[in-house]
Amino acid sequence: MKNLLLLFCLFLNMASSCQSDGDKNNGEQTNGLEKVTYAVSNEVFTNPERGFMHTWQVNSEGAAITAASLNNLKKENVSLILRLYYLEKFKTTPLSQTQLDLIKTDFTRLREAGLKCVLRFAYTDAQDGSDASVAVISGHLDQLKPILEENKDVIAFVQAGFVGAWGEWYYTTNQLTTPANKKLILDKLLESFPKEVKIQVRTPKIKQDFVATTTAMDATVGYGTSNTARLGFHNDCFMASVDDYGTYTNVTADKTYISNEALYVPTGGETCPPANVPIASCSIAETEMTLLKWTYLNLDYYGPVLQEWRNNNCFTDFERKLGYRLSVSSSSIKKEVALNGSLEFNALINNSGFAPVYNPKNAFLILRATTGGTIYKKKLNFDVRKVVPKVTFDLKESVSLSGVPAGTYELLLKIEDSSSKLADRPDYCVRLANTGIWEATTGFNKLSQTVIIK
């Protein structure tokens, strides 16, 4: 009989140890807290203001972007476009109402499609073409200012533009690249674009001359809204020569400078035909984009470089890594909280992308009633911009549950756009790169945690 009892107990023990609910997110008790760990996802998906992008350029008074074209981008996991306006008809005159209406229509369609743009204006696409005077540029920016303010929610970043061929601050016919004129134009750009919008200049020297220092800013400046904190970089000959066709003056020093600055301001652009260097391999591209913290890259140019990455199986990896890619490794809470008390919420957040988030977001802990589904949003102090690549961010918050009735609630994390126009749009919410936690209909990330308020 004793032998039978021992065998029965052994069977129960084995059965218990083999049980599994099949969930990849596992819970455990630690120091009285319920800890859940999460599986990282390898899926390619979109997130706002980052990734590979398509370029759409349009001449003066041309056709607006079609809704169908924008909606098709979602099939490519693209959330960002470069919208380049050539103002060749207006080198000596104000912008027409037709031109202004074109820009307004584009912004409306971007918003309807759930996308954003990198914005640039230029007067010519030819090296021997002409640009406009400082006075004309200033007048055009005055005309654009109210439109830009109204539509700042769908402007991810702005490339400085206006000067020279393609708006790349070279080949000017109006002496726009003298130190005095560069300062006038940058001052006007910073005044005309909303303070929330970061402006990218073509070379590090342009910014260094403007702010009168070669020392990269620190976090005290970088997370603010000063002019220094608003100037990032775009490179339209990325990895194409030793100095990227004149992008760098002192290559090593300039790259270090951009790497440090890019903790706070965006870098992005496109490749171009290589000169006296081999085409950028997967390993070279990985190294450069990691160092310089690239957040977006043009899909439409330069084709042979992009094909090199496709042929060597790193293109998909770059789809994941361009910009930010946030994931949660674990979260911990106390399962029971007193009515109108505070919930101690801890989470470890990682960023496996090349870059941080650059535009401020609003983060909320969502409590959703397990019975009835009523939702309560609790604002967090969490600044998602501070989750930088390769450094685990330790999120610790005491969340007031004032106003939340007694009951059982599941917990979710929402990171939404700072604009009230977009806050409720899932397309503009940050999706975490974890398995099985994204809710596409709400923009919530499920934490597989429940709390009981009593």
Where is each model-derived feature located?
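Catalytic-core regions of glycoside hydrolase
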Residues: 157-159, 168, 173-302
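Boundary/entry segment of secreted carbohydrate-active catalytic domains
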Residues: 27-80, 84
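An active-site-proximal structural segment forming one wall of the substrate-binding cleft
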Residues: 99-115, 132-157, 179-192
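Aromatic-lined substrate-binding rim segments of carbohydrate-active enzymes
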Residues: 68-124, 134-137, 197
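Active-site groove signature of glycoside hydrolases
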Residues: 118-127, 144-176
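Extracellular/luminal regions of secreted and cell-surface proteins that mediate adhesion/ECM remodeling
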Residues: 24-25, 318-454
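Catalytic cores of secreted or luminal carbohydrate-active enzymes
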Residues: 281-331
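Bacterial Sec-dependent N-terminal signal peptides
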Residues: 1-3, 10-37
